[in-house]
C-alpha cells in the first residue's frame, strides 16, 4: 500500500523515530487495555486482546508493559474509550480514513477536523470515503524471516488472499505483507505464527482500491496533515489512498 509505505519512509527520513516509537507503545498499551476491558483479561478467550498482545510482542514491547496494560483494565479503572471512524478528503482529493479510540469524542473530533481544515482538506460523512477502500486483514513479517516464495507458500496454505513484499532502504529492512479476508485474520495469524513466530504486526486495515498521485506543493501539505493526525493522542490509525513519486519524496529531505 503506497500510502502506508511512503509515509513510513518519510517519517524515517524526518528523524521522528524516537517520538514514533513512544507513540507506538502508547497506542499498543491503549488497545490492550481497551480489549481487556471489553472482552476480559484472558488472552485465549478474547480474540481482540490476543491480537493486541501479538502486535505488542511483534514490536518488542516489554512483557511488563503488556501485563501492566492488561492489569489497568481489570483494576477498576473508570476510563471509558469509544472507537470512532472519521472519513474525509485531503490535498489533491485523496481519501483519508482516521480511526480513533478516545475518552473525549469532542476533543478527538476537533483535533481531526483541525488537521483536515488547516491543510486543504475536509471531513465527510460516514461512508463518503470507505467505499474507496477494502477492510481486510494485514499481517507483516520482516523480509529476513523467509524468502518470498517460502512466505507466499506458507501464507496461501494458511488461508491468505494476497502476499506482497515492500523493499527496504538504509533505514528499513523491508517487509512481507500478507492480506486476508477480514474474517480470516486470526486464523491466518495462527497458521503463520506456528511457522514464523509472532508477526511484527497483524490487524484489520483499510486497503485502498486505487491510488491518487500527489505532486508538487500538495506533497508537503499532505505530509503536514498526516503528521498532525498521527500526533494526536486519540488517533490509532490513519489510512489514505495516495502515492508520491520518488522525485517528490526527495524534495522533502
From Swiss-Prot:
Belongs to the TACO1 family. It comes from the Bacteria. It comes from Maricaulis maris (strain MCS10) (Caulobacter maris). PANTHER family: TRANSCRIPTIONAL REGULATORY PROTEIN YEBC-RELATED (PTHR12532:SF6), TRANSLATIONAL ACTIVATOR OF CYTOCHROME C OXIDASE 1 (PTHR12532). GO terms for molecular function: DNA binding. The keyword Glycoprotein does not apply. InterPro entries: Integrase-like_N, TACO1_YebC-like_2nd/3rd_dom, TACO1_YebC_N, Transcrip_reg_TACO1-like, Transcrip_reg_TACO1-like_dom3, YebC-like. GO terms for cellular component: cytosol. This is Probable transcriptional regulatory protein Mmar10_2433.
Amino acid at each position: 500500500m503506497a500510502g502506508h509505505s511512503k509515509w513510513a519512509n518519510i517519517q524515517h527520513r524526518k528523524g521522528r523515530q524516537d517520538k514514533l516509537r513512544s507513540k507506538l507503545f502508547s497506542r499498543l498499551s491503549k488497545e490492550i487495555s481497551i480489549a481487556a476491558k471489553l472482552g476480559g483479561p484472558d488472552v485465549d478467550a478474547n480474540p481482540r486482546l490476543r491480537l493486541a498482545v501479538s502486535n505488542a510482542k511483534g514490536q518488542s514491547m516489554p512483557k511488563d508493559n503488556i501485563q501492566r496494560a492488561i492489569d489497568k483494565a481489570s483494576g477498576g479503572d473508570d476510563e471509558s474509550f469509544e472507537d470512532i471512524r472519521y472519513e474525509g478528503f485531503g490535498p489533491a482529493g485523496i481519501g483519508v480514513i482516521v480511526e480513533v479510540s478516545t475518552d473525549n469524542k469532542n476533543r478527538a473530533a476537533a483535533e481531526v477536523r483541525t488537521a483536515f481544515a488547516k491543510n486543504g482538506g475536509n471531513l465527510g460523512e460516514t461512508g463518503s470515503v470507505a467505499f474507496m477502500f477494502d477492510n481486510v486483514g494485514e499481517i507483516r513479517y520482516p523480509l529476513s524471516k523467509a524468502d518470498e516464495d517460502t512466505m507466499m507458500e506458507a501464507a496461501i496454505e494458511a488461508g491468505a488472499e494476497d502476499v506482497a513484499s515492500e523493499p527496504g532502504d538504509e533505514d528499513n529492512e523491508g517487509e512481507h505483507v500478507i492480506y486476508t479476508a477480514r474474517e480470516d485474520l486470526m486464523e491466518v495469524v495462527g497458521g503463520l505464527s506456528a511457522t514464523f513466530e509472532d508477526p511484527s504486526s497483524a490487524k484489520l486495515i483499510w486497503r485502498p482500491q486505487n491510488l491518487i498521485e500527489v505532486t508538487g506543493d500538495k506533497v508537503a501539505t499532505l505530509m503536514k496533515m498526516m503528521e498532525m493526525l498521527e500526533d494526536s493522542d486519540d488517533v490509532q490509525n490513519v489510512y489514505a489512498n495516495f502515492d508520491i513519486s520518488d522525485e517528490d519524496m526527495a524534495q522533502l529531505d
